[in-house]
């Protein structure tokens, strides 16, 4: 399970995040799983930093329900949105399965994530499909393929997997 080393995520949010990234990037014969790759750490660091606090977002409103092409239309910082989505996903998972996401079997996780990504699961005011597709998945892919200095892609494992040598450290 998660340790207290996270900067932004609570232990429950970290457990959900680790389960998400491990399901989306499972450990196999090719290498480490998502948590070992540092994807959960990357997500936590992004949410704990300037990005997570909405440093470059206009958050003064008015906030109206828009279309997907209108972009981000919420009065929440990315960190607040991530946490609201975690709470919503946990509540929806408890209602559907009677247990949290990190305790589900792989097939249950897959079915649930497909329903979330497809917009079939709502949790109160949180559109979990929008949350997953516009926040979680981009953070996941960034964490997998970013420069390891940001916490993800440990040992450049994702780069090695796709044959990318990385940038030379020359000055």
Q: Would you name each region that the model predicts?
A:
Residues 2-3, 11-19, 23-26, 30-171:
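Mature-region segments of soluble proteins
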């Amino acid at each position: 399970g998660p340790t207290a080393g996270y900067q932004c995520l609570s232990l429950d949010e970290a457990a959900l995040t680790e389960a998400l990234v491990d399901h989306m990037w499972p450990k196999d014969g090719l290498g480490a799983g998502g948590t070992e790759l540092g994807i959960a750490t990357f997500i936590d660091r992004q949410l704990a930093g300037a990005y997570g606090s909405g440093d470059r977002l206009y958050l003064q409103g008015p906030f109206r329900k828009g279309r997907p092409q209108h972009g981000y239309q919420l009065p929440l910082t990315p960190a607040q949105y991530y946490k609201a989505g975690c709470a919503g996903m946990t509540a929806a998972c408890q209602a559907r399965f009677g247990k949290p996401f990190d305790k589900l079997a792989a097939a249950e996780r897959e079915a649930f994530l497909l329903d979330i990504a497809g917009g079939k699961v709502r949790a109160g005011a949180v559109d979990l499909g929008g949350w997953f597709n516009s926040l979680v998945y981009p953070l996941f892919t960034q964490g997998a393929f970013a420069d390891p200095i940001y916490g993800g892609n440990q040992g450049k494992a994702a780069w090695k997997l796709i044959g990318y040598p990385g940038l030379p450290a020359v000055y």
